[in-house]
């Protein structure tokens, strides 16, 4: 059988129905590609307690997707390790990492795939991501979290001057997000890249459990001398926070309990420290690192203190 052109990897944890909706959107909007085997779909389940694995097995029995694989990761091993499990069984020349709470619109995958095929200097690309209300998800359009960018973001300077090159470096707010252009980093909710590039960087860094891994992924691609591109001319819907439960807008649909949310919040702030140690430790004075880590600890304590059982 001819190898697929694109492997679509969806990592799921406790978001059964959202994942099924995401898969259905692919089957509906790309019926020719999935029926012919040009696109393959790989669903990795991180030991979800909500019956996801069985539901995916049932979906496989009735789907018309020619190549549909279900992978049991064997445990809740995190975002990076879970996606790497999917890579091991992927056969496509290109790979798309897609969050389970994402709905892919018609023509988006085709346009994004065509773009990266014709731009060999681009290592990875994302489309515009919006939530259910059409609100822009800036995570698909970011600068790297340098000490200055991070300070401006958490201090509120970025909100005060959202289009400033000086103060809005993390969100890159001076760029027109309705156009296609280069950015530092895109969101792990939608990342498409050539498999050969992923092989060169060793795929996802498993030192990250949840959060931060997409920034590291993009940073590693930059180190190859390649660009990261954002395509504002095509879009997908990303609900966001469905698995983590840390976003207020999606707390009504998350199945995460208070202990799981605490774990995820801790992983989020730990990821900030990991990224700094890996990429900025030797670029800035030790005193600055101590100051930054103290600030991260304060932010973590505030986030944990704000958690309430609804």
Locations of regions flagged by a protein language model:
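N-proximal low-complexity "stem/linker" segments adjacent to membrane-targeting elements
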Residues: 1-28, 32-37
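Active-site-adjacent helix/loop segment of glycosyltransferases
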Residues: 219-309
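Glycine-rich, basic loop-to-helix element that forms the pyrophosphate-binding segment
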Residues: 72-90, 111
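A short, conserved alpha-helix in the catalytic core of glycosyltransferases
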Residues: 176-237
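Short, flexible, basic/aromatic active-site loop/helix in glycosyltransferases
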Residues: 144-183
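Short aromatic/hydrophobic "clamp" motif used to bind/position activated sugar donors
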Residues: 95
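Acidic donor-binding segment of Leloir-type glycosyltransferases
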Residues: 24-75, 85
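Conserved donor NDP-sugar-binding/catalytic core segment of glycosyltransferases
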Residues: 103-141
């Amino acid at each position: 059988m001819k190898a697929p052109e694109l492997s679509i990897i969806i990592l799921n944890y406790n978001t059964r129905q959202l994942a099924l909706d995401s898969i259905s959107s692919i089957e509906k909007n790309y019926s020719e590609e999935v029926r012919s085997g040009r696109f393959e779909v790989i669903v990795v389940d991180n030991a979800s307690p909500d019956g996801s694995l069985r539901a995916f097995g049932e979906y496989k029995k009735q789907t018309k997707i020619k190549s549909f694989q279900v992978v049991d990761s064997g445990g809740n091993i995190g975002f990076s390790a879970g996606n790497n499990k999917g890579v091991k069984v992927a056969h496509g020349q290109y790979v798309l990492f897609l969050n389970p709470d994402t709905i892919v619109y018609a023509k988006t995958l085709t346009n994004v795939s065509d773009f990266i095929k014709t731009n060999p200097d681009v290592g990875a690309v994302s489309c515009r991501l919006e939530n259910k209300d059409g609100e822009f998800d800036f995570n698909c359009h970011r600068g790297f979290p340098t000490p200055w960018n991070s300070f401006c973001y958490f201090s509120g300077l970025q909100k005060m001057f959202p289009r400033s090159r000086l103060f809005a470096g993390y969100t890159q707010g001076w760029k027109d997000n309705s156009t296609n252009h280069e950015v530092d980093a895109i969101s792990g909710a939608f990342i498409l890249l050539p498999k050969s590039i992923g092989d060169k960087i060793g795929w996802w860094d498993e030192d990250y459990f949840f959060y931060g891994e997409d920034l590291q992924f993009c940073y590693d691609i930059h180190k190859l001398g390649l660009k990261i591109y954002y395509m504002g001319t095509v879009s997908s819907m990303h609900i966001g926070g469905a698995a983590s439960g840390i976003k207020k807008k999606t707390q009504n649909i998350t199945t995460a309990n208070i202990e799981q949310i605490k774990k995820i919040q801790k992983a989020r702030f730990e990821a900030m420290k990991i990224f700094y140690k890996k990429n900025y430790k030797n670029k800035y004075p030790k005193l600055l690192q101590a100051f930054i880590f103290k600030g991260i600890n304060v932010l973590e304590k505030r986030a944990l203190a704000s958690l309430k059982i609804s």
